[in-house]
Regions:
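Residues that define the transmembrane beta-barrel architecture of outer-membrane proteins
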Residues: 172, 254-262, 295-301, 333-341, ...
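Outer-membrane beta-barrel architecture
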Residues: 130, 261-265, 303-307, 340-346, ...
Length: 484
């Protein structure tokens, strides 16, 4: 599959921005706000539930195992014919090419980074979504995505099957597909003030497989009970300028950029009665576009875990998280599909001060490379440890401070025959202040750094630091704080 960076930015952001949902909490547990600079925290109000769409079909009775296989096969046939018509001989599949791929070893392909790390996961999300919207649960849908990816590698292209594509398409695609599937249902359930027809259209934009199967009347496309999770949504639009830039071997240069950003936290811990029984009952999704391309996309969900508490003021969840990260801050690029052990929690320090946070560490199949490199293409693949720490401090209903730190440590695990090492750090710090009701303003600092010995001893650090001002819209009060 071929993928254009600008088109991917427009598509993914459009899917995200089609979700006009608001934070959900128990309105009976809300705290009254007070006048002054340090008003009490008000948990987000319950979302609009007017004119609900029927989602009550029992999922176990509505599962269809044959139809998703047929739909995935039809999708692959149409995609192959399109690619062969417009992109050339790599898709001129024949019985001879299929037989050759069946008997050849799996390799690492050399498609563009955006194709491999954005296009293939999105293609995998289509496979996954077709199974999921036929009523199948997470792990069974993952099996369809894995099988669909293998079939494409062998019979969808004439090139040798690629192990990096198999991983990002099936695993990264399933993580992405589940988040999009739940976003679509969130819109269908809550509506955001939209009429049912517009909700159906928006849900189809977010998850095309779900939209298709709802249009076809497939029973499994209506069979999902969310449990009414607590959510937090934030939209941002603004501009940033470069404070510090060290290109290293990159030929890319861009001092200023316009950016759009969408954030969704789903299933935040603390809501009474909400349970974490299924993969991605909690997830965090963020996409940022800058200058018409995807600058970052991070998607993290709880695969297996449980809730816990500590006293009256702290609620949390812990377990194994699955994640897909994509970073492309102009000078270098990174992608990781990972499993991590971690925890997400909320601490109500006082009536006017609260803290939310996440910490995790794990290992991922990681790709690293340089944007418009002055040296021969340096994209590298392999396993790499990674860590994540995120913190949000909330001051009443007036302001929040967000801090995020990501670290990727790629050394000999990347390539056992090489002593080269790669170290990537991504840090974000932002303060958001309420101007009026749902309208806010944010000041955000982002630093992206890569230390690599791949280019020889003493090679310079690739680094880009930016600061920007953003208009911010939050559909609800409370900055995502959950009441209990």
């Amino acid at each position: 599959m071929r993928w254009n960076g600008g088109k991917s930015a427009v598509l993914i952001l459009a899917l995200a921005l089609a979700l006009p949902c608001s934070a959900s909490a128990d309105p009976a547990r809300e705290l009254d706000s007070t006048e002054g600079a340090t008003s009490r925290i008000t948990p987000g109000r319950a979302a609009d539930m007017a004119q609900p769409i029927d989602l009550s079909i029992d999922s176990a009775q509505s599962r269809n195992y044959l139809l998703p296989a047929l739909q995935i096969g039809a999708f692959q046939f149409l995609l192959n014919r399109f690619d062969n018509l417009f992109l050339g001989d790599d898709f001129a599949v024949s019985l001879r090419s299929i037989r050759r791929n069946l008997h050849s070893g799996w390799t690492t392909d050399n498609d563009s980074f955006v194709v491999n790390q954005i296009g293939h996961p999105y293609q995998g999300s289509i496979y996954y979504g077709l199974a999921r919207s036929n009523g199948l649960p997470f792990w069974q849908s993952f099996g369809y995505a894995f099988a669909g990816s293998a079939v494409w590698e062998i019979a969808g292209e004439t090139t040798r099957p690629s192990k990096n594509d198999q991983i990002t398409t099936s695993i990264g695609g399933s993580f992405l597909g589940e988040s999009l599937f739940r976003m679509s249902h969130l819109l269908l359930e809550r509506g955001g003030g939209l009429a049912p027809a517009w909700r159906e259209l928006g849900a189809a934009a977010i998850s095309p497989p779900l939209g298709l199967n709802r249009y076809l009347g497939v029973a499994g496309a209506k069979a999902f009970e969310s449990g009414q999770p607590a959510t937090f949504v934030r939209y941002q639009a603004g501009a940033s300028t470069t404070l510090n830039s060290n290109l290293g071997p990159s030929l890319e240069r861009g001092d200023n950029e316009a950016a759009l950003e969408f954030n969704l936290d789903y299933g935040l811990p603390g809501k009474n009665g909400y349970q974490y029984r299924r993969p991605f009952d909690y997830f965090s999704f963020q996409v940022r576009t800058a200058n018409r391309s995807v600058e970052s996309l991070t998607n993290r969900g709880l695969l297996v875990g449980s809730a816990y508490s500590a006293g009256e003021r702290y609620r949390g969840i812990w377990g194994i998280y699955g994640s897909f990260d994509y970073l492309a801050p102009q000078v270098f690029r990174l992608s990781s599909t990972a499993l991590s052990l971690g925890s997400t929690g909320q601490w109500r320090i006082s009536p006017s001060l609260a803290m939310q946070g996440h910490a995790s560490a794990g290992i991922g199949y990681t790709a690293m490379g340089t944007v418009r490199s002055s040296v021969p293409r340096d994209d590298r693949y392999g396993l790499a440890p990674q860590m994540l720490l995120a913190l949000r401090m909330v001051l009443g209903n007036d302001a929040s401070l967000d801090l995020v730190a990501r670290k990727y440590l790629a050394g000999n695990l990347i390539r056992s025959s090489s002593d080269a090492t790669d170290r990537v750090f991504r840090g974000e710090a932002s303060i958001t202040m309420r101007v009026k009701r749902n309208h806010l303003v944010s000041l955000k600092y982002i630093t992206s750094r890569r230390d690599s010995t791949l280019f020889g001893p003493g090679a310079p650090t690739q680094r880009r630091d930016t600061i920007g001002v953003y208009y911010t819209y939050q559909p609800s009060d409370g900055f995502g704080i959950v009441g209990w």
